[in-house]
Amino acid sequence: MRHSVVLDFKKCRGCTTCIKNCPTEAIRVRSGKATILPNRCIDCGTCIRVCPHKAVKSVCDDFSALKNYRYTIAIPDPALYGQFQNLDDVDIVLNGLLELGFDHVYEASAACEMLSGFARERILKESDRPMPEISPACPAVVRLISIRFPKLINHIAPVITPSEFAAITARQQAVKDTGLSPDEI
C-alpha cells in the first residue's frame, strides 16, 4: 500500500510532537529522526497538522497528470465546501474547479444520496449483518478500525465508497455525453 504521508528527514528535529499525537502509534524516533511505521499508519494527516518543523507532508499526484486525459472531471467531496468561511454559494467552488481546467464537475454529494438509498434497502433486506454498520467512506477510519479495532471490521458496510461510486457514475455519463472511451476520461 502506498501511503500519502511522508517525512522530510532534513527538516525533522526529533521533537516527538508527531509521536504524541498519532492515533495509531505509527511513528517512532530512530537516530534522532521520526520514522513512520507503514503497517500502522492510517494516513489521517494528524502528524502533518501538528509538526512544528513542517517535516511531514502529504504526497499527491502532480496536477499535470490531468493532461494525460482528453476529458477531465473534478469530483469534489461535500467536505470541501466546509474549507471556506462564509461560503453562501457552492457554485463559486464548482466554477473555480472549472477555471482550474477541468472539463466537468460532478458533485460527490449526488453519489452519496444514491448510495445511501441503496445501502438503506440492503440493510433492510440483510438483517443478519452486524449492527451498527460503519460507512467505508473515509479510508483513514477504515484503516484505523483494521489496526486498532479489528473486531469492528465486519461492521464496515460492504459497499463501495461514495467517491468510487461518483467516479464510476461520472465516467459512465461522460462516455455517453462525449463519445470518448473510458480510458480518455
Labelled PLM ranges:
Residues 2-42, 46-61:
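Iron-sulfur cluster-binding cysteine motifs and their immediate structural context
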Residues 60-185:
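Iron-sulfur-associated redox domains of electron-transfer enzymes in respiratory
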